[in-house]
């Protein structure tokens, strides 16, 4: 395993954090989650930051946290809206980026009862709006797309491990 940085992207509730933890464990790497890093850095919960300071302030914090996290090897799970910042998308150019996909009904089911600030109110309508606004960013940065709607986490992790290994082999052979 020569990949030093694997980044997971996707919609809220797609499974990025759960897959990230399992993938990092399988690879013997550290897992970081951009939302958790923001909370550690600020000492505040994400909903509080949104309600007090707004989304733009949160996105700036997120961009800074991601930049710092990318300086270290490991698996990094990004928040669902991280790719709305062009600077963040550009920083991912040298990373192996996995787009964690889930169908909208599954995202809605998984997000029920959560305190995600951008899903407040009519969660289905908000998810559809977020999907429309973000859907082009994920494939733009992705090295690999994996579906999590009906797959157990272990199968998703195994698929990523296979692809990362194959990508490493291609990189090694192209450098010969």
Regions found by a protein language model. Give the residues of each.
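Conserved glycine(s) of the Walker
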Residues: 15
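Short glycine-rich anion-binding loops that position phosphate/pyrophosphate groups of nucleotides
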Residues: 80-83, 103-105, 151
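P-loop (Walker A) phosphate-binding loop of NTP-binding proteins
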Residues: 11
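A glycine- and Lys/Arg-enriched "phosphate-lid" helix/loop adjacent to the NTP-binding pocket
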Residues: 94-137
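NTP-dependent small-molecule kinase module
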Residues: 1-3, 18, 22, 26, ...
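Short, flexible helix/strand-to-coil boundary loops that buttress conserved ligand/catalytic motifs
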Residues: 42, 62, 70, 111-112, ...
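Hydrophobic anchor at the beta1->P-loop junction of P-loop NTPases
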Residues: 8
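ATP-dependent small-molecule kinase phosphotransfer cores
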Residues: 33-91, 137
């Amino acid at each position: 395993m020569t990949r030093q940085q694997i980044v997971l992207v996707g919609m809220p509730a797609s499974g990025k954090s759960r897959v990230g933890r399992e993938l990092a464990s399988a690879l013997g790497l550290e897992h970081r989650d951009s939302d958790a890093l923001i909370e550690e850095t600020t000492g505040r919960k994400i909903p509080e930051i949104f309600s007090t300071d707004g989304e733009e302030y949160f996105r700036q914090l997120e961009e800074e946290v991601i930049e710092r996290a990318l300086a270290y090897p490991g698996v990094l799970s990004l928040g669902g809206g991280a790719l709305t910042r062009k600077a963040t998308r550009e920083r991912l150019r040298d990373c192996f980026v996995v787009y964690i996909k889930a169908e909208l009904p599954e995202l809605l089911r998984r997000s029920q009862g959560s305190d995600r600030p951008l899903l407040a109110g009519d969660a289905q309508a908000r998810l559809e709006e977020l999907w429309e606004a973000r859907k082009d960013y994920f494939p733009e940065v992705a090295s690999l797309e994996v579906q999590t709607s009906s797959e157990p986490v272990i199968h998703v992790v195994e698929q990523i491990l296979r692809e990362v290994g194959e990508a490493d082999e291609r990189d090694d052979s192209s450098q010969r």
